[in-house]
Design a protein with these regions (language model features):
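Short, low-order "capping/linker" segments at domain edges
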Residues: 117-123
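Short N-terminal helix-initiation segments at or just after the protein's N-terminus
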Residues: 14-28, 60-61
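N-terminal beta-strand motif that seeds the catalytic metal site of vicinal oxygen chelate
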Residues: 1-21, 74-81, 121
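Conserved Rossmann-like nucleotide-cofactor binding loop
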Residues: 82, 116
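Conserved active-site tyrosine of GNAT-family acetyltransferases
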Residues: 23-24, 91, 115
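Short, conserved charged micro-motifs
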Residues: 18, 84-89
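A generic "binding-loop/recognition-motif" signal
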Residues: 15, 37, 84
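Vicinal oxygen chelate
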Residues: 2-7, 29-76, 88-112, 123
Length: 123
């Protein structure tokens, strides 16, 4: 089998730079590369993977949880935390919103500024 290497995850947004800036502040990461409509961020030490963001002119904000006919989420990020409530407060201070529906006690679903859900969970 040929060697295949996953190098990151690309997230569509109406404004790649704005969404990359949100996740950069949320995670404490740095910008690795930036071009008009495209940004890569990663941990300052180079570990933890990478997230790429691209501007999509026809971006449709997902609805979570989705109902019939709603734009569904395509993926979500799982972010381990050591203090759930402090991490939620940090996420909200950076521009996230707490989702109205919370399916588990030890997980908090938040929405980034472009509407993508992400989960904060105790590890």
């Amino acid at each position: 089998m040929p060697r295949l290497t996953l190098t990151g995850t690309n997230i569509d947004a109406p404004d790649a730079n704005a969404l990359a800036d949100f996740y950069r502040r949320l995670l404490g990461w740095t910008t690795r590369a930036e071009e008009p409509g495209w940004v890569i961020i990663q941990a300052a030490d180079g570990g933890g993977g990478r997230l790429s963001f691209q501007t999509e002119s026809r971006y449709v904000r997902p609805v979570w949880p989705a109902g019939p006919g709603d734009q569904q989420m395509m993926m979500h990020l799982e972010i381990a935390v050591d203090d759930l409530e402090a991490s939620v407060a940090h996420a909200v201070a950076q521009g996230a919103t707490l989702a109205g529906f919370q399916p588990q006690e030890d997980v908090r679903v938040c929405l980034d500024p472009a509407g993508h859900p992400f989960c904060l969970f105790l590890q």
